[in-house]
UniProtKB/Swiss-Prot annotation:
<dbReference type="InterPro" id="IPR020934">
    <property type="entry name" value="Ribosomal_uS19_CS"/>
</dbReference>
<dbReference type="GO" id="GO:0006412">
    <property type="term" value="P:translation"/>
</dbReference>
<comment type="function">
    <text>Protein S19 forms a complex with S13 that binds strongly to the 16S ribosomal RNA.</text>
</comment>
<protein>
    <recommendedName>
        <fullName>Small ribosomal subunit protein uS19</fullName>
    </recommendedName>
</protein>
<keyword id="KW-0687">Ribonucleoprotein</keyword>
<comment type="similarity">
    <text>Belongs to the universal ribosomal protein uS19 family.</text>
</comment>
<dbReference type="InterPro" id="IPR023575">
    <property type="entry name" value="Ribosomal_uS19_SF"/>
</dbReference>
<keyword id="KW-0699">rRNA-binding</keyword>
<dbReference type="InterPro" id="IPR002222">
    <property type="entry name" value="Ribosomal_uS19"/>
</dbReference>
<dbReference type="GO" id="GO:0019843">
    <property type="term" value="F:rRNA binding"/>
</dbReference>
<dbReference type="GO" id="GO:0003735">
    <property type="term" value="F:structural constituent of ribosome"/>
</dbReference>
<dbReference type="GO" id="GO:0000028">
    <property type="term" value="P:ribosomal small subunit assembly"/>
</dbReference>
<keyword id="KW-0689">Ribosomal protein</keyword>
<dbReference type="Pfam" id="PF00203">
    <property type="entry name" value="Ribosomal_S19"/>
</dbReference>
<dbReference type="GO" id="GO:0015935">
    <property type="term" value="C:small ribosomal subunit"/>
</dbReference>
<dbReference type="GO" id="GO:0005737">
    <property type="term" value="C:cytoplasm"/>
</dbReference>
<dbReference type="InterPro" id="IPR005732">
    <property type="entry name" value="Ribosomal_uS19_bac-type"/>
</dbReference>
Length: 92
């Protein structure tokens, strides 16, 4: 179920304040965050946000196409190594 339009998009306050400070000083630093649930706002464009995937912080460079999506969509939590090759000799 999608979020109600009357509520508006969600972003954590600490993340928004960090980005606002960087925009005021026009600095480009990597911002570390654990907030995968935050929506990407237009103010985030051009910044690199390190999103936690449960193991490490994955750097995500925010572009215009990402606005409206969640930060967690760009930092996968599971590593897929593929299925094993067909082992025909054990199957009869």
């Amino acid at each position: 179920m999608a979020r109600s339009l009357k509520k508006g998009p969600f972003v954590d306050d600490h993340l928004m304040s960090k980005i606002a400070k960087l925009n005021e000083t026009e600095q480009k630093q990597v911002v570390k965050t654990w907030s995968r649930r935050s929506t990407i706002f237009p103010q985030f464009i051009g910044h690199t946000i390190a999103v936690y995937d449960g193991r490490k912080h994955v750097p995500v460079y925010v572009t215009e196409d990402m606005v409206g999506h969640k930060l967690g969509e760009f930092a996968p939590t599971r590593t897929y190594k593929g299925h094993d090759a067909d082992d025909k000799k054990t199957r009869r």
